[in-house]
């Protein structure tokens, strides 16, 4: 009787182990992030997701190897978490919310500030990049946006906006017609 109980416990633990150690999709998600240029937006900043889909279409026309995709976070908390931990390299927000993210104020007050560099403006929206986003990728992305500007309503170079100091170095190189930088592996 005791042996049967022990055997049944072992079997139950074994099945629980199998269930919880099954192949998780986490590895696939990391691979997906490496294969695609993800541009994050959020439901809580209403105009960002529809515009991110337009932006992705233009980028994929101009730079198909980027394999750009729109990604949408549910909340500002999730946006800050993914962006500040370098899990999402690009983020499209309204100007007001972009400033709040960088300063850790407004809707991001509870979650803290996050470093960001500016890639491009689209009317009231701003495309931000991680400071660690490679200069070469920022150059390629900026070049694709410039080439597709006619399809991007309100696209405005950061060079045309006064008082902008945090432009991504790769973006500056592209806008100043400098040659594409080499990819530096860290």
Q: What are these model-derived regions, one by one?
A:
Residues 33-48, 68-71:
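Short, well-ordered beta-strand elements
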Residues 64-81, 162:
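Short helix-initiation/N-cap motifs at beta->coil->alpha
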